[in-house]
């Protein structure tokens, strides 16, 4: 167990997977080393093979996928908003963006579209994509899908919004 007085050091520890404990009335933060990034359930990509670099792919757990992105992008500007969609399935969906890079009007529009869903359930990311498309008749893609966390991180750094859907890699 380590103690910090500087919140930036504590935030850096949190972003690397450590447990941070705040105690009311104490001017220090306790860091409990964990760094338990998930390894189970992470798959090799099927259709997006690369000759150099990692072939690590997303799993079917939104929590694992969020951790895979955070493992590569340890910036405090990386924001994550959780929403539950589906009256019966209560599917967890995460919206991730980089504060200061992403266009907030785009983020708010996607968030608004997701909150308007009146549906029994979302079973995979394909359903989510179809329901959030603005111009479904357009021949041009409005979404880019990937199986790879490194490509998702690259998209975040370009200012795009990343949607992660539970039960769907």
Segment roles from a protein language model:
Residues 1-169:
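Cytosolic regulatory modules rich in charged/polar residues
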């Amino acid at each position: 167990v380590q103690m910090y007085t500087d919140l930036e050091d504590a935030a850096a520890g949190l972003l690397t997977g450590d447990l941070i404990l705040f105690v009311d009335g104490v001017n220090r933060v306790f860091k409990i080393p964990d760094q338990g990034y998930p390894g189970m359930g992470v798959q090799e990509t099927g259709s997006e093979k690369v000759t150099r670099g990692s072939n690590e792919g997303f799993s079917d757990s939104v929590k694992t996928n969020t951790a895979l992105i955070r493992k590569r992008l340890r910036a405090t500007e990386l924001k994550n908003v959780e929403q539950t969609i589906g009256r019966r399935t209560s599917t967890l969906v995460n919206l991730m963006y980089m504060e200061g890079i992403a266009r907030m009007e785009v983020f708010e529009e996607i968030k608004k579209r997701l909150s308007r869903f009146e549906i029994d359930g979302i079973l995979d990311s394909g359903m989510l994509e179809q329901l959030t498309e603005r111009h479904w008749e357009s021949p041009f893609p409005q979404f880019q899908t990937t199986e790879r966390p490194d490509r998702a991180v690259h998209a975040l750094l370009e200012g795009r919004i990343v949607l992660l859907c539970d039960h769907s890699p």
